Amino acid sequence: MSACQTPLIVALDFPTREAALKLADQLDPALCRVKVGKELFTSSASGIVETLCDKGFEVFLDLKFHDIPNTTAMAVKAAAEMGVWMVNVHCSGGLRMMVACREELAKRSGPQPLLIGVTVLTSMEREDLAGIGLDVDPQEQVLRLAALAEKAGMDGLVCSALEAPALKAAHPSLQLVTPGIRPAGSAQDDQRRILTPRQALDAGSDYLVIGRPISQAADPAQALAAVVAEIRG
């Protein structure tokens, strides 16, 4: 059973291990999980994941793997061996890539991390997709990739809260992980398709990723407690 009692995932979006651990030391693993992304992982190597696990946190390794099937599957296997709770891959890598990852995790005798597919990045709008040759609305592309992810046996999807209602209706078994969450009154920064924590949960999101409103707060522990209070009503 998970030690974390909320759907919150705090993004440790820092350039150094020291800065990330300074924030982690102010957070309660019972109130949030943590996300390790590309910058932090690259600057501190795999040891950051083990250190966070030792502190009691469940870790979402957000590296968005996207490569040929075997290479991606081996990367997912390595992440599982670190003890991560969740790992993600780009759905646009295709069905065979996602199936290879699923099959590799199925070989494990120990705990398996949640395998999550990335659909359309929350910073992208229709004009951004058009720029890479996709003349579709973000919502339509999300639904296309979601169907592919379900066929591959993925555990869930990263998606914006605006796509969550349609995804829950079409794919109720998939767990939805939503970035771009901003408590009421927060700046939007570079995330375009956003909702508040309560709105996102009501829309069908299962896990909420929150970064700067907590990580850049004067008192991160207090900021986290405020978000917990908001979602608990």
Swiss-Prot record:
PANTHER family: OROTIDINE 5'-PHOSPHATE DECARBOXYLASE
The organism of origin for this protein: Pseudomonas putida (strain ATCC 700007 / DSM 6899 / JCM 31910 / BCRC 17059 / LMG 24140 / F1)
InterPro entries the UniProt entry points to: Aldolase_TIM (IPR013785), OMPdecase (IPR014732), OMPdecase_AS (IPR018089), OMPdecase_bac (IPR047596), OMPdeCOase_dom (IPR001754), RibuloseP-bd_barrel (IPR011060)
BP GO annotations: 'de novo' pyrimidine nucleobase biosynthetic process; 'de novo' UMP biosynthetic process
EC number: 4.1.1.23
Residues that hold substrate according to the record: 13, 35, 62-71, 122, 182, 191, 211-212
Subunit and interaction comment: Homodimer.
Taxonomic classification: Bacteria, Pseudomonadati, Pseudomonadota, Gammaproteobacteria, Pseudomonadales
Hydrolase listed as a keyword: no
Keyword presence, Transcription regulation: no
Gene Ontology molecular function, alphabetical: orotidine-5'-phosphate decarboxylase activity
Catalytic activity: orotidine 5'-phosphate + H(+) = UMP + CO2
Active-site residue list: K64
Gene3D superfamilies for the chain: Aldolase class I
Keywords: Decarboxylase, Lyase, Pyrimidine biosynthesis
NCBIfam families: PRK00230.1, pyrF
Cellular component aspect of the GO annotation: cytosol
Pathway where this protein functions: Pyrimidine metabolism; UMP biosynthesis via de novo pathway; UMP from orotate: step 2/2
Listed name of the protein: Orotidine 5'-phosphate decarboxylase
Family: Belongs to the OMP decarboxylase family. Type 1 subfamily.
